[in-house]
Amino acid sequence: MKPIKIALIGAGNVGNSFLYAAMNQGLASEYGIIDINPDFADGNAFDFEDASASLPFPISVSRYEYKDLKDADFIVITAGRPQKPGETRLELVADNIRIIREIALKVKESGFSGISIIVANPVDIITRAYRDASGFSDQKVIGSGTVLDTARLQFAIAKRAKVSPNSVQAYVMGEHGDSSFVAYSNIKIAGECFCAYSKLTGIDSSNYEKELEYPVSRRAYEIINRKRATFYGIGAAIAKIVSNIIKDTKNIMIAGANLRGEYGFHGVNIGVPVVLGANGIEKIIEISLNDKEKEKFAKSVAIIDKIYQDAIKNI
């Protein structure tokens, strides 16, 4: 396997959490950091270099310019204005679309041909704006989508069912935000219907929205209200996406993907199950949704599509 080169654009808490997770998992041999503040990028690179001395394998970390992206395998983009306490992700849209468009053009001009992973919020809209501005293929532009929401859901279910999160198959789909929903009809534990665990967990089809969907959707706000930002969880989740692509696992994970007729929608980037492999998103998986879930999915699509369309008219 050839040495992997990963570039981070945006050296804030989320980006640094991803890079630290990636380093400790040995995902790449070379890392580069681009930030609007070159001194900040240098400082983080120096700090990561110091950390690398304790790793059992050699790596390099340095500040990059956009011209250094040409032979990178991955770009992880976290740059954008941060979310404020009490502010929804969708309120960030106008400022962060402007930022991502500028980044997309610089990335394209560099000759980059690898895989772009977008994390900046509101991620569904920002990923779409990046894809449109860059012209890169759907396969190679991946949003973090509801990958963190799904991890939170799996953890919550595992805790109630007294099993490992690795034994839980469950998805949060739709917008990474307030209109996301739990695909309750698809939840399984070790391949068995979640309904078999209703007595143990106290959760069934009549109360899952209160017991699972609502707490999972509010988790980010609970963290932000207490410590102003979330970053370790999403950093680890992005490292998991990158790891699955590098290792060509063909694992099914939730990610932000551009729909081309799947689930009956076109052109919207949204959190859905996908197959991850060496080419990025190798397939979008259309799981069966019940009528209630289909309605929630359509509502989520409509919300992010309207905001995107309104935003690009005014930028």
Swiss-Prot record:
Known EC number: 1.1.1.27
Enzyme class at the top of the EC tree: oxidoreductase
Catalyses which reaction(s): (S)-lactate + NAD(+) = pyruvate + NADH + H(+)
GO biological process entries: glycolytic process; lactate metabolic process
A Pfam family this chain is assigned to: Ldh_1_N
Binding site for substrate: 83, 89, 121-124, 149-152, 230
UniProt keyword Cytoplasm present: yes
Pathway this chain belongs to: Fermentation; pyruvate fermentation to lactate; (S)-lactate from pyruvate: step 1/1
Keywords: Cytoplasm, NAD, Oxidoreductase, Phosphoprotein
Residues the entry annotates as binding NAD(+): 14, 35, 66, 119-121, 144
Main location: cytoplasm
Gene3D superfamilies cross-referenced by the UniProt entry: Lactate dehydrogenase/glycoside hydrolase, family 4, C-terminal (3.90.110.10), NAD(P)-binding Rossmann-like Domain (3.40.50.720)
The protein's role, per its UniProt record: Catalyzes the conversion of lactate to pyruvate.
NCBIfam families in UniProt: L-LDH-NAD
Protein name per Swiss-Prot or TrEMBL: L-lactate dehydrogenase
